[in-house]
Amino acid sequence: MATVTQADVTVTKIGGRIGAEIGGVRLGGDLSDATVTEIRAALLAHKVVFFRGQDHLDEDGHEAFAELLGAPVAHPTVPSADGRYALGIDSHHGARANQWHTDVTFVPAYPAFSILRAVTIPPYGGNTLWANTATAYSHLPEPLRVLADSLRAVHTNEYDYAALKPDALPEALAQYRDVFTSTKFRTEHPVVRVHPETGERTLLLGNFVERINGLTGRDSRVLQDLFQSHIESPENTVRWQWRAGDVAIWDNRATQHYGVDDSGDHERTLRRVTVDGDVPVGPDGEPSRLLSPETVPDPSFGIASGASAAA
């Protein structure tokens, strides 16, 4: 494995197309500008970076570190775990498990970065996979790249929750759905966005996609599955086996991820803080647009997604 060392910080590549482990860093809000610059550079290069042994990190430190990467932003509909920005990811509902997705793409300016901290990890299973949507695009055959460049798709937070977790109690699914869709969003995105920092083209799809514009439901599904097969290809992914105290940070503009629900009844608890993003722009220069509601409402704490970028 290739290791790049600068000062006390090490960056060790762990996947051919995606993923690196960073050592020599104690995460928190007191990191030097130089260290934050190194972390951000590794994040843009490797798309997801991992830190072991961050057991000292609590809710305050988690959010303070997030502020070094940008403006933290709360989830548009789901209440936080701490009354501020940290979203609880746990084994009780598992509604986002067992599916490939990019966080919160049902709003126009979805998060730029997600920072996930492991609190309680089961004795087996519960891994997370990430896929590189930039290399998925660049490795497409040219005719498919040309096609993808021309497409737009509608993303929504309304989807079939029961199909994702068929063994869950109906009342638990109904309760989670009521919260998750307390505001029903529909946003039109380009299928290919131009990354605002790297200039790379990335595929913008995942399980929030309702339909590709201009196609029948069947044709849209077939085309989505075709593009997703390139995103999910094993050589385009990295898998992380969690330990308590681990932290993963990913570029949400250039990745999808998949939480594996395979740890039985064992508890799995993580906390996620997201950093505000900007409105995607396609290869033709056309930005994403919110279809409904008319505006993104302010969450119970903090700013609405995209508010810091628009300011």
Language-model features, listed with the residues they occupy:
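Non-heme Fe(II) oxygenase catalytic core, chiefly the N-lobe of the double-stranded beta-helix
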Residues: 2-247, 253-311
